[in-house]
Structure formats: structure tokens, C-alpha cells
From Swiss-Prot:
Residues 290-306, 417-426, 493-509, 578-600, 1119-1151 have a biased composition (Low complexity). This is Negative elongation factor A. Residues 89-254 form the HDAg domain. It comes from the Eukaryota. GO terms for molecular function: RNA binding. The lineage of its organism: Eukaryota, Metazoa, Ecdysozoa, Arthropoda, Hexapoda. The gene is Nelf-A. Residues 277-289 have a biased composition (Basic and acidic residues).
């Protein structure tokens, strides 16, 4: 009932306020508002159109003050919901009117909306001008309207005469008619005064007269009664006066008629109504009499017939009894009742932007073959008989979009059905002016192109699920499939959308609107158990992260969506884009090479930049299991059959907090260059893997040729068509044609690549290789990189403008994900270098827009802090004139034993440095740990000569801005994935291709290069409140604020040089090569991102690039191998606990969180029934829904259970009796997975006390 009421309210609002001819509104709807209507408006407010929302809010200004006081709570709730709206005008207007119900004045102080503050200030100034302009008119006191002219003049004074601007030459016709009517009325009045006064009593004049009454009530009798009471014989008693005053029976023109109260004459309408009621009563009496007579006659006839003919048929008897033959319901067997219940359960909660189209599209997809009812009778709880002409009759709707809809099944079957359904789960539960966020994922069993319309769904009546769905995956045959399941509140109208406002259909790309989907794995990551045979265990690789990193179309604005389908092997290279993100290959070793190419050519994937579907890596426990697998298979299949990390899915609620989570290694692949395979085999693994790596050489060359064939749309190869290893290489877009692979490979020898690694260990050991594949035609240093993609939006490599052909740019959306972009060594200045920059308008500086409004104040202050001219800043020259350079600072910190040339020492305590800042007054120095908490300043010129830089790691605390922590030998920062239930989204860092000193947005050539030094870039969160003022940063630290995230410090340091207890070290051959090439640098990037107290993950990447552009010797750069030593997890626990304690003690950091409309609805429903939840608990629940992953009440399980309400209910018992139970409703917030669920506890009440 509530849904119907909400839909009626929203429909009424759209009818009243939806017209576009007037942009503002008067108080026309205020008379129809009440508390109940305002509550309904609050429920359906997010689904209204933008102009309706604005007009509704403005109409509140017309509500009388008495009603505003009475409806204060409801008005404030509506304004609060409006303040969370995604439309800036609506939220800003709601912020302006926030104080209106309480104070009857507007809110002129806005602090939260940074980017709309200038507009708001302009609006307030305009309002002030209008008020001052009209304030001199002077409002008179209220009592002045009761004064006459002389008294008003005495109170107010003589008013100035109104200015006469023009004179009419001829009076209009209306004025002439008016004067004539005035004359006539005056004449009539004068003639009335001349007439004599009537002799009727005054009380009888106003007596109502019955229209049908013929008694003359004319007032003056024709003969004046001059003889008193006409008879002197009648005594003049007062009691008999009424009788005497009656008119005689024979006289018709008497003056007065006296009646009783019961005979009081009625008006014409009332008399007519009474007459009609009397007629109806008479007719009912007549019908009852007829029925009684007919019943008596029928009974008599029936008894007579029964006595005379006992064998007469019952039909004859019925015919004789009343002539009415009973109709048996046989028609129900061949006609099916059309019900629309499952599809319209939540129809009213959907978007009302186009309610007719939404409903029609929902009906059009329920179509089924009505001629074959035998298979549909088991699941006929949804409408199947609506014809396709409903969709076709609407002009402009593409018929391509009509897809298959599965019947509504029970929840157990629905989870299995969702691989069939996941490309059709459309939901209109969004704000209308925003294009819906979209995900389309198809599994390999269901290959349904968008242009095929399925007419018939074959369901099995016993299981109630579609017969073409895939079977539940078994453990050995198929690895865990990814099931996309929409949340239960959104399971309405699953069908293709034919909404005209949002659907765009092109030849190659068919957009299909999708809702955000919760991703649930059918089999958790522990499903890949060590007991499975090594031949069938496969490493699941999802190309989704790679698509986010390299898809040139995935990062469009939120209102544009592009469907991308994968290239069909080598044939459809021109239409190549990214392959399906969540398809899973059931790889049997025998049929692997045959099956993989056709499987991956079909499933398209449609994803918006703001709808993440991330596959996160499993924790260290899973990796340990994978390491323990026996490597008994042959060397050709070892890499694939031992998965290094099982892949788990992230629920949507955690994906929404992408910017608040730490990094996660998504996928890793060993990709080795062709030249160094033998040398690497000796370094990284046992000698048995060398044969395998030689096989990988040829495979990778073939793979690279196939990739370069598809570089025009920047494709990624779905999976290498060999069984042993899974590799993805994303190439920078090129402008060459793509027909000839070999020539292109030779023409483009220095192709910078974005490489994602699916890391696999051939042997159970802790060494992992990260290498990029470069074409064999060049002799340069290969790029070694670990690519990480952000969960919130995708990063794409696209060519820059035509004026700058030497640059490729990474286009970042409004919520910019960082990206590790590396290229091969730059041979010439005209060669392609990878730079990272923001999409922006020309002639405007780079601005990073926060995704949520709450983070904007932080964001602005962080920007001011970046642009403040500190003396330590190094401004790097910009290559694009229209962009403002980011200021970056460099601080190299080799934390080692006492070395050469100590200049001075600082004593920095990690606890005392909580709210302090190390300010280096000298520009050319670095800090070096000399033991304990002592640090030593060393000039940068001495860094290149320091050889004892090994054996050191660097830790940062989350307690203060840049406090330095001393390192113990056991506290090495590891490449770790801790605590099995915690999945955190990755964070990426921009680095330049050359090992310069600057971490900048754009850089052609580094301005100053420190010779023979490796660098380490450390990004750490700043947990102090930035709003308290601008913090002075030490030299070498750059504060970076990303939208929706806490500020981070970027720090570039000298990296350790030896292999002793280091995070990332280079091998001995690489060290020797580094000494031979004094200009060659190595960049090492360490990301420390600890947004939550108990969730810590660190991500280590390394890149090696030879500075060949500066050497002038293109063959001098030797390939290098970088080994990552994964140490024991237990060493990190003390440090992690220490950081957790420090973080929990500090002031809370304000986060940029935002709630979707769906979550707002859920929270309203939850809190409306809750009677035991406090305001802090409500805030905690809302923060969790909005994506906050810091548990404010830490416990061992990192799970909170909050009591929402308790009621008393009578519950049916098993024995048939009802018992009074206390029903407690709780909500369970799992900070590990980001999921929440509500449940109820039933407690039996004491029956005696209850009675």
C-alpha cells in the first residue's frame, strides 16, 4: 500500500510541478500538503525530476508560518533528503533552506559545498539587493487597514499622490456599461424607498420557501384585515392566536402560513434528494416482493418436479428452479491469468522520469509463447502474454535491446539463475537525470548477442529455472563462477530498457542500462583446495582490472556508457576492445587450446567508470595454500596449475568505498623478456623451469604480435592460447594500421606497454618475478611494472592531441584513480612517453573534483596547501601550456647504518612526532637513520657514493604527517595480503618514465637527475585534520588529496641497494649493470595506505628504465631482474598493531562519503521501524552504508551488531498455539567484507506476566 501511495504522490507532484513553462513555483500546492503527504514526499523524493524537486522546495516558502511550525519535523526530513541529492542545484537549495523550518530564515553560511560556494554567494548577494531595493516601500502596521482616510493620514502622514503616467482619450466599453448599471441600481433603490413598508412580521421574511409550495407568501394581502380578527364572537385568548391568524380555507392570497417543525420546507436540491430516496426504497420493496414470489413459485415447481420425475437431470432442475445454469470454471484450463505482480513489486520506487516507458519496457520483456502453455504452467506467476508490439509500438525504442527474462524463482534457485540473468538485471532505481550505472557480464555458456530477441524461455517445472542456464559448477571441472546478483530490494522489472531518454544504440556498441550489482561468489576462494588435481586447477584471471587500466572508452563521464565486446580471436581485430571481465574458463588441459578462443570472443562487458566490479586477490593464507600444492605436473603446465592467489569477489558495498581502502594486488603474471629467459631461470626458480621459460619466449612473441594487431582500439588479449601461463599486455594506442603484425612489431620496437601480471609460481618458493615483455627487435631495457587499477573508476591510455603526437595521456575521470604508467627507455625526445593528467577544459588548471561533497573542504585546503609557495617546492616545467603543474618535492631518506659525511643529527620520536613536522631548512640534504631515533642530514651530492644502503626498510606511522619511524631488523615492509576476510581496493601512484626526482603529473625530461641513485616513492595517508590550518610540509613531501579520500603524502627516497632484508632489491647482475651505467636509475614505488585501523595492505612495484636518451647509447641498457622477497607475515604484526593503536587514538578524519538513493531508501525503511537505535548508532550505520570501513568500535572479529528495535508479537508455535514473543531486530555490520544484514531474535515472554 505504501508503494501505491508513494507512486500516487510522485505522480501528483509531477502533474502539478512537472510543466516546464514556469521555472519557479508559487504556493499552489501548499493548500494540499499535510503531514502524511510530506512523509510520502520524503519517501519518493529521490525519484522525482530535478525541476519538480526545485519547485517543491521553493513552494515550502509559501507555507503559512503556523503550518511550518506544525510540520517542522516533516519539512526538515524532506530538506535533509534533498541535501543528499546528487543534483547540485537541489542539494544547494536544500542547504540554503536548511534553517527555514526552524528560524523562518535562509541559511546564508555554506561551508560544505566548495565548488558551488561562488554560485551560492552570488545568489545571496542578488537576494540582498532585491531586499534592499524593495525595503524602502515601507510596510504599514497591521491596524492601518481598519482606519478611515482621515485617521490614516493622522497616523502615517500625507501619502504622495500616485504619479499619473497617461490619460485615456476614450473610456472603454466596460466603463460605460458600469456607469449604466450604477444608474439603474440607484433608480431602483429610490423607487423602493417610495413604496410603503410591509405589515408582515420581520421574522417571516427570511423564511425559506419550498419551491413546490403553492401557498402565496407575498407579504401584503389583497384585502387588508381592518376588522381585527374578523369575528367579534371569538375570544381573544393568547393561546388561540395562531389559529386565528391562519388564512381561511377559501382564500388563496393570505399573507402568512404557520407550519410545524417537521414540515419545515426544504431547499429544492434537498427535496429532490429526499424524493429520489423514497423512490429507491419503493423500488427495493417491489423487487423483494417479486423475488419472494418467484422463490415461492420455484420451490413449489421444484418440489412438484421432484415428486413427478425423480430422474430429471440436475441441469433441468436448475433450469426449472431459476433458469440459471451453473457454469463450471473449465475455461481456466486453457486461459492463463496475466499477472504483473513480480514485475511491479517495486515499480513505484523506480524512476518516474518516464513512468510509462519503464512500465512498457518491463512488460515487453515478459513475453512468452502463449501457444505453448504446457511448459509455462509451473512458473506462471509472472506475465507472459503481453505481446512484443508493446515495445515495438513505441517510436525510437531500439528493438535490439529486448532480452530474455527469467521467471522469478526462489532464492536458492535465483542464485544459480543469475549467470543467465546478469546481463538483463535492469533497475530504474536511480535519480532520473543521471544515466544509470551499467554492468553487463555474460558467462561463457550463455552467448546471447544483443541483437537476438529470445521469444521462448524453456523452464523445467520441477526446478523452476531456465533450462539454458549453466549447471552449478563442480569443484574439479569448473572454477568458481562469478554470479552477479542484484540486491533483493531491486529485483523488479528485469528486462531490457526501452527508455528513450537514456538508450543509445550504435553499430558496434549497444548500451544496456544496468543497476549496480552485488557480486557474490558461488564458491568462495577456498574452493580451490589443495586436494584438486594439478591438471585441472586453473588460475582465474579476470581481464576486468586490465580493462579498467587500458580501455580507452571506459573512463567517459558518468552520463555516457559504452559497451565493449572482445575481439574474436584474430579475425575481428578491428572491433577489438576489452574482453569480458567476469567470465571464468573451465579449463581442462586436453581441450584448453581449442576452447579458449571461442569462449572469450563472445562475452561483452559493459561497465561505467563509477561502477566497480573488482576481483581482489586472496589473503596470504590462500597464497600459502597455493604454495603448498605439489608441483608434480610437467613443466609445461606448472605455471597454470598452481594458482598463486585464489580470486574472490568484492561486494558492492565495499566497492563503493574504493577511495577509502588500501591497495590490493589484483592480478599478477610472470611475463619475461625473450632475451633474459635463461638468465632469469637461474635467478628466480629451479633449473627445471628453464625449459618452460624458453617456451614462454615464443609464446610471448606470438602474444605480442597479436596484441599489436589490436592496438588501434587498445585491446587486451583475453588469454594466451597456451595452457601454461596467463598473460595480458596492454599496449599504448598507435596510429598505424593493424594488418601486418610482423612489420609493425619491427617498426615499433620501443612500444611502451602497460602490463598486468597474473603472478604464478612455478615452484613453492617466495620469489616472484615482475617483468614486462618488450619486442625482440629492440635492444633496450624492458619495463618492469606491477599494474594496479583503482576500483572506483578505470584508467585508460589514449593519444593526446594532434599537436603533441609524442605524448600519450592517461585520461582520469572525476574520481581520478592513480596509475603506474611506465614506458620503455626513452631513446629520443620525440618518442612516446606516458604521462598522466586530468581531463579538463582548455586554459584551466588541473582540478580534481571530489566524488562526494563532504570531502570538498578538505580538498580545497589540500589544493591551497599544494599551491602555497613553500621554499622547498620544486616547480617542474610543464609541457602542456594549458595545464597547471603539480608541485612536487623530493626527500631522499636512506635509513642505514652510520655512513659517510654526517652533517648534523635530528632526534625524532615517533610518538612526539604525532602532531609535529620535521622541517628541513636546508634544500640539498636527506635524512639518514644512524641508530635509535637519531637521524642524520646528508647532502644529496654524497648519496651517489654511499654503498652501504642495504638492510634498511622504511615505515611510516599513520599518527602524524611525516613522522619518521626507526626501523628494526624484523620490521621489513612486505608485499603482503593479510587477514583473510579483508579485501581492500588498490591505490596507484603516478611516476615518470625516467628515474627523475619528481613525482609529477606531466614531465618530458626530468629537470635534475641524481646520478647513480635508486629512488623510492612512498605515499602515506595524512591522518591529522587538514582543516585545522595549512601544515608546513618538509622538503620532499607532497600532499596529494584525492576525492573521497584522505590526504596522502608522497615522498621520494633513496632506495636500498643490496638484497639483505629489503622490500625490493635488484640482483647482483643488475647491481653490476647499475655501476656500469651511471645514468641508469631504478624507481621503486612503495604504497602504504592504511585508512582503517585493522586493514593494512602494502603494494610494491618496481620499474627499471635505462636512461638511453641521456646516454646516447641505445644498446647500453641491460635488462634487469627485480626480485620481490615475500617474508613471513608474522614479522609485520607488531608494527601493524602499533599503527592501529596510534590511529585509534587520534581525532576522527572527515571522509568524503556519499549514499546512493537505494541506500537512502533502505536506511529510511530500517530506521522507520527502529525504536531502540540511538543517534550515534544511526550515524555509524549510515557511515557504513556510505562506505566507511574504519570500525569505530574495534573488536576481534571486526564485526558490529547493533540493536535496531524490539516489539512484542504473537508468534504461531509448532503445537498450534500462539505465544507472546519479544522480537528484537538487529543489524550486523561486517567491516571485513563490507556487507550488512538485518536479522531478528525471538525471545519467549513470560506468559503469566504478559496476561
Amino acid at each position: 500500500m505504501a508503494n501505491v501511495r508513494d507512486s500516487d504522490t510522485s505522480l501528483w507532484l509531477h502533474n502539478k510541478l512537472g510543466t516546464s513553462n514556469d521555472s519557479w513555483i508559487n504556493g499552489s500546492i501548499c493548500s494540499q500538503l499535510n503531514k502524511e503527504v510530506l512523509r510520502n514526499i520524503k519517501e519518493c523524493f529521490p525519484d522525482l525530476q530535478t525541476q519538480v524537486k526545485l519547485k517543491l522546495l521553493l513552494s515550502f516558502l509559501h507555507i503559512p508560518r503556523r503550518l511550518v511550525e506544525e510540520w517542522k519535523a516533516e519539512l526538515e526530513e524532506v530538506i535533509e533528503v534533498a541535501g543528499l541529492d546528487s543534483e547540485l542545484w537541489v542539494s544547494m537549495l536544500a542547504e540554503t533552506m536548511k534553517t527555514f523550518p526552524a528560524t523562518s530564515s535562509l541559511n546564508t553560511e555554506i561551508s560544505d559545498y566548495e565548488d558551488t560556494r561562488p554560485i551560492f554567494i552570488d545568489m545571496v548577494n542578488d537576494l540582498r539587493k532585491l531586499v534592499t531595493k524593495h525595503s524602502d516601500l515601507g510596510m504599514l502596521p497591521l491596524e492601518c487597514q481598519y482606519l478611515n482616510k482621515n485617521a490614516l493620514i493622522s497616523v502615517v502622514g500625507q501619502q504622495p499622490a500616485p504619479v499619473k503616467h497617461f490619460t485615456l482619450k476614450r473610456k472603454p466599453k466596460s466603463a460605460q456599461l458600469r456607469t449604466e448599471l450604477l444608474h439603474k441600481s440607484a433608480d431602483a433603490q429610490s423607487s423602493l424607498k417610495k413604496a410603503s413598508a410591509p405589515t408582515i412580521p420581520l421574522r417571516s421574511r427570511g423564511m425559506p420557501r419550498k419551491m413546490t409550495d403553492t401557498t402565496p407568501l407575498k407579504g401584503i394581502p389583497s384585502r387588508m384585515p381592518t376588522t381585527g380578527f374578523r369575528s367579534a364572537t371569538v375570544p381573544g385568548n393568547a393561546a388561540q392566536r395562531p389559529n386565528l391568524s391562519r388564512t381561511p380555507a377559501g382564500r388563496k392570497d393570505g399573507g402568512i402560513k404557520l407550519i410545524e417543525f417537521t414540515e419545515q420546507p426544504l431547499g429544492y436540491a434537498a427535496a429532490k434528494k429526499r424524493k429520489r430516496e423514497q423512490q429507491l426504497e419503493e423500488q427495493q420493496k417491489k423487487q423483494e416482493q417479486k423475488q419472494q414470489q418467484a422463490a415461492a413459485a420455484a420451490a413449489a415447481a421444484a418440489t412438484a418436479a421432484a415428486s413427478n420425475a425423480g430422474d430429471s437431470s440436475p441441469t433441468d432442475a436448475a433450469t426449472a428452479s431459476g433458469g440459471e445454469t451453473p457454469v463450471t470454471p473449465t475455461s481456466a484450463n486453457n486461459s492463463f491469468e496475466i499477472k504483473m505482480e513480480p514485475q511491479q513489486l517495486n515499480q513505484s520506487a523506480g524512476s518516474l522520469e518516464e513512468p510509462q516507458d519503464d512500465e512498457m519496457s518491463g512488460k515487453a520483456n515478459m513475453e512468452c509463447d502463449i501457444e505453448t502453455p504446457e511448459y509455462a504452467t509451473a512458473t506462471l506467476d509472472f506475465a507472459q502474454a503481453t505481446s512484443t508490439s508493446v515495445a515495438d509500438g513505441q517510436p525510437g525504442k531500439p528493438a535490439v535491446e529486448t532480452k530474455l527474462k527469467t521467471p522469478r524463482t526462489p532464492k536458492s534457485a535465483a542464485k544459480l539463475n543469475n549467470n543467465n540473468n546478469n546481463n538483463n538485471n535492469n533497475s530504474f532505481n536511480h535519480t532520473p537525470k543521471r544515466i544509470k550505472q551499467e554492468i553487463e557480464i555474460k558467462s561463457e555458456e550463455i552467448i546471447v548477442p544483443a541483437s537476438i530477441k529470445l521469444e521462448k524461455i524453456e523452464t523445467s517445472p520441477s526446478t523452476q529455472r531456465v533450462s539454458i542456464q549453466q549447471q552449478p559448477p563442480s569443484l574439479v571441472q569448473r572454477t568458481p563462477h562469478l554470479l552477479i546478483r542484484s540486491s533483493p530490494q531491486k529485483r523488479q522489472n528485469n528486462g531490457a530498457t526501452t527508455s528513450a531518454g537514456t538508450t543509445t544504440t550504435t553499430v558496434g556498441n549497444t548500451t544496456i542500462k544496468m543497476e549496480k550489482l552485488d557480486i557474490k561468489p558461488m564458491i568462495r576462494a577456498t574452493g580451490v583446495s589443495p586436494s584438486t588435481s594439478a591438471g585441472t586447477t586453473t588460475t582465474l584471471l579476470t581481464p576486468q582490472q586490465l580493462r579498467q587500466a587500458a580501455n580507452p572508452l571506459a573512463n567517459l563521464p558518468n552520463n555516457i556508457s559504452v559497451k565493449i565486446t572482445s575481439a574474436k580471436a584474430k579475425a575481428a581485430a578491428a572491433a577489438a576492445a576489452t574482453s569480458s571481465g567476469s567470465q571464468t574458463q573451465s579449463q581442462q588441459p586436453q581441450t584448453l587450446q581449442v576452447q579458449q578462443a571461442p569462449q572469450q570472443s563472445h562475452p561483452p562487458l559493459l561497465i561505467n567508470s563509477s561502477t566497480p566490479v573488482i576481483l581482489a586477490s586472496s589473503p596470504s593464507a590462500q597464497r600459502a595454500k597455493a604454495l603448498a600444492l605439489p608441483s608434480s605436473s610437467t613443466s609445461a603446465t606448472t605455471t597454470t596449475t598452481i594458482p598463486s592467489q585464489a580470486i574472490k569477489t568484492m561486494p558492492l558495498s565495499q566497492l563503493k568505498t574504493a577511495t577509502n581502502s588500501g591497495p590490493v594486488i589484483i592480478s599478477q603474471t610472470i611475463i619475461q623478456p625473450a632475451k633474459r629467459a635463461q638468465q632469469q631461470a637461474g635467478t628466480s626458480s629451479a633449473a627445471a623451469a628453464s625449459q618452460q621459460q624458453q617456451q614462454q619466449q615464443s609464446q610471448q612473441q606470438l602474444l605480442h604480435q597479436q596484441i599489436q594487431q589490436q592496438t588501434q582500439q587498445q585491446a587486451q588479449l583475453p588469454q594466451q592460447p597456451q595452457q601454461q601461463q596467463t598473460q595480458y599486455i596492454l599496449a599504448t594506442p598507435q596510429q598505424q594500421p593493424q594488418q601486418i603484425q610482423q612489420q609493425q612489431q619491427q617498426q615499433q620496437p620501443i612500444l611502451p606497454t602497460l602490463t598486468s601480471f597474473s603472478h604464478s609460481r612455478p615452484m613453492p618458493q617466495t620469489t616472484t618475478l615482475y617483468q614486462a615483455t618488450t619486442p625482440s627487435g629492440s635492444g633496450q631495457t624492458p619495463t618492469k611494472i606491477l599494474l594496479k587499477t583503482s576500483g572506483s573508476s578505470s584508467v585508460v591510455m589514449t593519444p593526446l592531441r594532434q599537436a603533441q603526437p609524442q605524448q600519450a595521456t592517461a585520461v582520469v575521470s572525476s574520481n581520478p584513480p592513480p596509475l603506474v604508467a611506465t614506458s620503455a627507455a626513452v631513446v629520443s625526445p620525440g618518442q612516446t612517453t606516458l604521462n598522466i593528467q586530468n581531463v579538463q577544459l582548455p586554459n584551466r588548471p588541473v582540478t580534481i573534483q571530489p566524488a562526494s561533497q563532504a570531502a570538498q573542504q578538505q580538498h580545497m585546503q589540500a589544493q591551497l596547501q599544494q599551491q602555497q609557495p613553500h621554499p622547498q617546492h620544486t616547480i617542474v616545467a610543464n609541457t602542456t601550456a594549458t595545464q597547471q603543474p603539480k608541485l612536487s618535492q623530493v626527500l631522499m631518506q636512506p635509513t642505514a647504518a652510520v655512513g659517510t659525511s654526517g652533517v648534523s643529527a635530528l632526534n625524532v620520536s615517533p610518538t612526539s612526532g604525532k602532531n609535529k613536522t620535521i622541517i628541513l631548512t636546508q634544500k640539498g640534504v636527506i635524512l639518514r637513520n644512524i641508530g635509535g631515533d637519531m637521524y642524520q642530514q646528508i647532502p644529496i651530492s654524497n648519496v651517489g657514493n654511499m654503498q652501504g644502503l642495504g638492510g634498511t626498510t622504511l615505515m611510516t606511522t599513520t599518527a602524524g604527517p611525516p613522522s619518521l619511524v626507526k626501523t628494526t631488523p624484523s620490521s621489513g615492509v612486505q608485499l603482503q595480503q593479510q587477514q583473510s576476510g579483508k579485501q581492500i581496493l588498490p591505490t596507484l601512484i603516478p611516476t615518470s618514465s625516467l628515474g627523475g626526482q619528481h613525482v609529477i603529473v606531466q614531465q618530458q625530461q626530468p629537470t635534475n637527475v641524481i646520478g647513480n641513485s635508486q629512488q623510492q616513492t612512498i605515499i602515506r595517508p595524512v591522518m591529522t585534520n587538514v582543516g585545522g590550518g595549512l601544515t608546513t610540509l618538509p622538503q620532499g613531501l607532497t600532499l596529494i588529496q584525492r576525492p573521497g579520500q584522505q590526504p596522502q603524502l608522497v615522498q621520494v627516497q633513496a632506495a636500498p641497494g643490496s638484497t639483505q632484508r629489503t622490500i625490493i632489491t635488484q640482483s647482483n647482475t643488475a647491481a653490476a649493470a647499475s655501476q656500469q651505467q651511471p645514468r641508469q636509475q631504478q624507481q621503486q614505488i612503495l604504497v602504504q595506505h592504511k585508512p582503517a585501523p585493522t586493514l593494512q595492505q602494502r603494494l610494491v612495484t618496481s620499474t627499471t628504465s635505462g636512461g638511453q636518451g641521456q646516454q646516447g647509447n641505445p644498446n647500453a641498457g641491460l635488462p634487469r631482474t627485480v626480485q620481490v622477497q615475500v617474508q613471513a607475515q608474522q614479522q609485520q604484526q607488531p608494527q601493524q598493531q602499533q599503527a592501529t593503536q596510534q590511529q585509534s587514538q587520534q581525532a576522527p578524519q572527515r571522509r568524503g562519503l556519499s549514499l546512493s538513493n537505494e541506500h537512502v531508501h533502505k536506511a529510511h525503511e530500517m530506521f522507520r521501524k527502529a525504536n531502540r537505535v540511538s543517534r550515534p548508532d544511526k550515524a555509524l550505520i549510515l557511515g557504513f552504508m556510505a562506505g566507511l570501513r574504519e570500525n569505530p568500535r574495534p573488536n576481534n572479529e571486526n564485526v558490529l551488531v547493533i540493536k535496531l528495535g524490539e516489539t512484542e508479537e504473537k508468534v504461531q508455535q509448532d503445537n498450534g498455539h500462539t505465544a507472546l514473543c519479544l522480537v528484537e531486530s538487529h543489524i550486523r555490520l561486517d567491516y571485513n567484507t563490507g556487507e550488512w544484514k538485518t536479522f531478528q531474535n525471538y525471545r519467549l515472554q513470560d506468559q503469566s506476566a504478559a496476561s
